[in-house]
Amino acid sequence: MKTPLTEAVSTADSQGRYLSVPEMQAAFGRLRTATASLDAAKGLGAKASSLAEGAANAVYQKYPYTTQQSGNNFASTPRGKAKCVRDIGYYVRMITYCLIAGSTGPMDDYLVSGLAEINRSFDLSPSWYVEALKYIKANHGLSGDAALEANSYIDYAINALS
């Protein structure tokens, strides 16, 4: 998984040199935001279950047909609802991984690269997940720098789905 810091070190090492001043400044910049990112990851992790449940309910309210149509891809049964909550929880988990890594690398590697194909294969609407992520962004309970850090990755996921 690539992060700005690992890329800088890899580039410098492949060129047989020490990190440049701008590369070190970027690394120190990441270290300054690391505390806020870790606080955000802890906060999201602690509330992941309730956020996923609430986000699923927000999807059901905006798109009521998701609970009315039968089929494996809809939430008309308890099993379907559980799968919806599980999938939304996966997005929350990816966001926490990004917060810890300090980059979109985890989301790029494990989610975004195959997202369109997965949604197409299972006939899932990206708009459902966009709605869920908007709910999470509005209700995560984070504030200050932790909220800014979390929101940047939530926005990245929303843009990847749009």
From Swiss-Prot:
It is a peripheral membrane protein. GO terms for biological process: photosynthesis. (2R,3E)-phycocyanobilin binds at residue 84. It holds the Pfam family Phycobilisome. Keywords: Antenna complex, Bile pigment, Chromophore, Electron transport, Membrane, Photosynthesis, Phycobilisome, Thylakoid, Transport. Contains one covalently linked bilin chromophore. GO terms for cellular component: phycobilisome; plasma membrane-derived thylakoid membrane. Belongs to the phycobiliprotein family. Heterodimer of an alpha and a beta subunit, which further assembles into trimers and the trimers into hexamers. Light-harvesting photosynthetic bile pigment-protein from the phycobiliprotein complex (phycobilisome, PBS). Phycocyanin is the major phycobiliprotein in the PBS rod. NCBIfam families: phycocy_alpha. This is C-phycocyanin-2 alpha subunit. The lineage of its organism: Bacteria, Bacillati, Cyanobacteriota, Cyanophyceae, Pseudanabaenales.
